[in-house]
Amino acid sequence: MAAGVTATELRELADDELVQKLKESKEELFNLRFQMATGQLENNRRLRVVRRDIARIYTIMRERELGLTVSPEGAEEGAA
């Protein structure tokens, strides 16, 4: 995960995969903050990238909750 994840890539994930990705990103952010506090963080930009990834995940989850977009699982069920 050197670069951020695009919204298009996240929209292709199922709901449970999205929750897992959110959990991983939050853990990474925690570790980065810890490294920052101890002076071990080499790439400060990574903090910003991970925070934005988390925001993208929350946005996509909210879109699905409001019915603005359909999860890939729902699209497959409707087509079948």
Swiss-Prot record:
<dbReference type="InterPro" id="IPR036049">
    <property type="entry name" value="Ribosomal_uL29_sf"/>
</dbReference>
<dbReference type="InterPro" id="IPR018254">
    <property type="entry name" value="Ribosomal_uL29_CS"/>
</dbReference>
<dbReference type="InterPro" id="IPR050063">
    <property type="entry name" value="Ribosomal_protein_uL29"/>
</dbReference>
<dbReference type="GO" id="GO:0022625">
    <property type="term" value="C:cytosolic large ribosomal subunit"/>
</dbReference>
<dbReference type="InterPro" id="IPR001854">
    <property type="entry name" value="Ribosomal_uL29"/>
</dbReference>
<protein>
    <recommendedName>
        <fullName>Large ribosomal subunit protein uL29</fullName>
    </recommendedName>
</protein>
<dbReference type="GO" id="GO:0006412">
    <property type="term" value="P:translation"/>
</dbReference>
<comment type="similarity">
    <text>Belongs to the universal ribosomal protein uL29 family.</text>
</comment>
<keyword id="KW-0689">Ribosomal protein</keyword>
<keyword id="KW-0687">Ribonucleoprotein</keyword>
<dbReference type="GO" id="GO:0003735">
    <property type="term" value="F:structural constituent of ribosome"/>
</dbReference>
<dbReference type="Pfam" id="PF00831">
    <property type="entry name" value="Ribosomal_L29"/>
</dbReference>
